[in-house]
Design a protein with these regions (language model features):
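Structural beta-strand/beta-sheet cores of well-ordered domains, especially the beta-sheet scaffolds
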Residues: 9, 102, 124-126, 149, ...
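Charged (often Lys/Glu-rich) extended helix/loop segments that serve as interaction or gating elements
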Residues: 2-3, 235, 248-395
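Active-site loop/helix belt of alpha/beta enzymes
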Residues: 133-271, 363
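Conserved, mostly hydrophobic/aromatic
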Residues: 18, 43, 65, 97, ...
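Glycine-rich, aromatic-flanked loop segments that form ligand/cofactor-binding clefts
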Residues: 121-135
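Solvent-exposed alpha-helices and their adjacent loops that cap or buttress functional pockets
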Residues: 76-77, 96, 119-121, 143-145, ...
Length: 395
């Protein structure tokens, strides 16, 4: 299948890019930590083909709900190669995961109570999530004056110590892991240094004996001018006390692994002139490439139908999407840019993270997804239709 024949809108996965990101991060980890691994953040992009590639390249599945836990098992992850985080664990999958030897990080009080229902004829190891307030721990990386967190147990409030005490009282449960994930706005190496120093002090005060430390995610991928995987790992190592350098180090990248591996293509379908602007309508939507509606520009290219015979636009061009929402506007080209016409293709790059996962079933259902592999371009998820939409419904 040729790229010019693809039905738009669509996503295209670069398989080689995804694998390269995983392997380069893994290589960086093992340059400092013999005991380390990547937990791929399933929520960032849960496309089954992506999950299979992550699994086949040595990643664990980092999941944050009972749905994601079941999905990870369904696509073939070893039951011991799952990191189970977040507040949306079900009791049955929580107990199953602990019993099967997955890395389960306790998030709240109800999960501690669930531990009491495990069989008493053996011992179990679990992790616990520590609350990270960026404003207090690394204020230069804070997004606001009070960059607190609703996740994990707070050491300052005493709830972390209370949680440890409750777990210890159960008798056959050991805290062997710590989860300290926060994603700073800056994604700086310095942030992770500060968090590691903060947490290491708590590990010492609470006399924890850790098998693993889950540092979470929030890293840049391979981008010019941004920290590299190696710089992050060097920062981890330098901040860790020597007494903790033999602990298994876990990272949970999502964006850093999958963002650069996806493009999104959409086609210009109509052009109108009014109110001092040119309105360019496409068959794509901002919902697919910027679901938080925060971006002001994108990594993008244009594939023009007749590039040599194209005039310049005398007015600004407003590039908009397929939906009926007025604010489905992606970006604006200034006057003097090449005038877009029907049939032109706009290609968005680095759109693999929190895009497909958050695309709504609004007006247009999920688009085609292709993979660019040594075998050529292959369809790996067919565009949804009304049959996909209504399955499971009674009407």
């Amino acid at each position: 299948m040729g790229i010019t024949n693809l039905k738009t809108p669509c996503f295209i996965l670069d398989e080689a890019e995804l694998v390269r990101n995983i392997r380069e991060f893994d290589t960086a980890l093992h340059s400092k930590f013999n005991k380390s691994f990547i937990g791929y953040s399933v929520k960032t992009n849960a496309l089954p083909y992506v999950l299979r590639l992550a699994k086949d390249n040595g990643c664990y599945a980092e999941v944050v709900s009972y749905h994601e836990y079941s999905l990870a098992l369904k696509v073939g992850f070893d039951k011991r190669h799952i990191i189970y985080n977040g507040p949306l664990k079900s009791k049955s999958t929580f107990l199953q995961a602990v019993g099967d030897g997955a890395l389960v990080n306790v998030e709240n009080w109800r999960e501690i109570e669930w531990l009491r229902d495990l069989p008493k004829d053996r011992c179990y190891g679990i992790g616990i999530r520590l609350n990270i307030n960026i404003s207090k721990i690394s204020p230069e990386d804070a997004a606001c004056d009070d960059d607190d967190s609703r996740f994990g147990f707070s050491f300052e409030s005493g709830e972390f110590q209370q949680a440890l005490k409750k777990i210890s009282s159960i008798g056959n449960i050991d805290v062997v892991g710590l989860h300290s994930h926060r994603e700073p706005k800056t994604r700086s190496v310095g942030f992770y240094r500060h968090v590691i120093s903060y947490v290491a002090n708590i590990v010492s005060q609470c006399q924890l004996h850790l098998d693993y430390w889950d540092l979470g995610g929030g890293f840049f991928g391979i981008m010019s001018g941004k920290p590299t995987y190696q710089q992050y790992v060097d920062g981890f190592y330098e901040a860790l006390p020597t007494s903790l350098r033999d602990v298994t180090i876990v990272v949970e990248p999502g964006n850093a692994i999958v963002a650069s591996a996806f493009d999104y293509r959409m086609e210009v379908i109509d052009v109108k002139h009014h109110d001092g602007k040119i309105y360019v309508c496409t068959d794509g939507t901002r919902n697919d490439v910027d679901p938080f509606f925060r971006k002001t520009d994108y990594f993008k290219d244009f594939v023009l139908t007749n590039p040599k015979e194209r005039p310049l636009a005398d007015l600004p061009q407003v590039i908009s999407g397929l939906s009926c929402l007025e604010y489905d506007r992606l970006f604006q080209l200034p006057a003097g840019s090449v005038a877009l016409t029907p049939g032109d293709i706009i290609v968005f790059h680095r759109v693999g993270a929190y895009t497909m996962a958050l695309s709504p079933l609004f007006i247009h259902y999920f688009p085609n997804v292709y993979v660019s592999s040594p075998s050529g371009l292959l369809l790996i998820r067919k565009e949804w239709n009304e049959n996909n939409f209504i399955i499971g419904n009674n009407y």
